[in-house]
């Protein structure tokens, strides 16, 4: 609901980046069982991980980059999102991370990743890369044989046929299926969303952003985010300005999503930006670093900004992933990766085991336990803060005995007060206990993640005191971030394909607010009839 002081919903209803630092999933998972390892002496142990709402692949990338530090394991990542645009971004990001180094150097890959992942506006060369990759992926998705040959790490077998068709439509839109800037006027949509969020505080938006940064994000552990970069992102949506500001003017279509809105009793298909405008993409790679010198301070101020730390961390991430990007290793054929220059006498490092990313059907969290292939299958379950409401006993049954659960907390959501954060942590503990998990014992306290193990087994030696017992206030008995998974009738498949659902569509307060930032709905089977479903003027032309 929009008030004179703003809507207070800066996180939005669609997640494009995570609100927690990237973690190594091997460090969070239980160690390999020596008995099972002895039984499979000649086979590589497997690690099966189920991730709900990880949105940007940061945990998967860090896990692959750190794989050389652990005993060899074959990874199976099962990813469940609440919208197909997030699935498409996963695929695009991994395609970029595994790009042949001879085609794209390390620095170019790192900069392209940062802009596509976290900027609302792109440089023309980066936009051209997105169009080319999206066009390639649009041709691969409907052809399973070619997809398996060119992207052997990707599995779309669990998606429904209509979801694959919709995924193809997403890639075609990214590839420029609808020409012209009006197809997705990002700058106008961003400003409209900002006005709706801030209300009467819009003219004092710099003061609001400074307050949110210094009194909330800095106090919660993100002190390296600089005022200048945070203001720039809040104003324009450009988080990582790696070139002159004038170079960023092409809308980033990977941040577009479609929704069905109700207008005068009719369903209207609209495309807009409904992502985060409050916290920003700085947390995932920009507030922690393996190199402690990046986090040092001088006169009480950090010497590096979150943007600089993110650049360094992503470059190191892609450098460590070079073995995964080796052509033969990426095709699932482990071999020796040549070390050093040609003719080097150093022994070659073994190629890593192949990995597979399995994308599950949307809304399948409540039905996974019906399939025997998922029962007790996963050693680790990861749940993002916006998907906590999906945590249930049925989902817990899919975790193997002794398995672990890691839940992202709402630490970096600036719209939540401290008492709401504590209530949310308590609610997470209750849901985890009801799902059959118990808090881990010992370990360093964390306000960012809550960690549990599958109850009924010996307690491992880690605990996250961030999860406390107690009854939360009534207003937070339901997870406050449930808006990140909008009801199925309020969410639409990509606008180029499919038909609106036959059920009546209820317009939530989030949907009412979203009318201000939606752009002109495209023509096609989902486009409404002009005489009955005309989009209101503020939808066609958001507030300038």
Swiss-Prot record:
Compartment annotation: Cytoplasm; Dynein axonemal particle
Superkingdom of this protein's organism: Eukaryota
Signal sequence, renumbered to the chain: none
Ranges where the record places region Disordered: 328-350, 448-544
One GO term describing the cellular component: dynein axonemal particle
Coiled-coil ranges (or none): none
Pfam families documented for this protein: DUF4470, DUF4471
Gene Ontology biological process terms, A to Z: axonemal dynein complex assembly; motile cilium assembly
Compositional bias annotation for Polar residues: 522-536
Swiss-Prot/TrEMBL keywords: Cilium biogenesis/degradation, Cytoplasm
InterPro entries hit by this protein: DNAAF3, DNAAF3_C, DUF4470
General function of this protein: Required for the assembly of axonemal inner and outer dynein arms. Involved in preassembly of dyneins into complexes before their transport into cilia.
Family under the similarity heading: Belongs to the DNAAF3 family.
Name of this chain's protein: Dynein axonemal assembly factor 3
Species this chain originates from: Bos taurus
Higher taxonomy: Eukaryota, Metazoa, Chordata, Craniata, Vertebrata
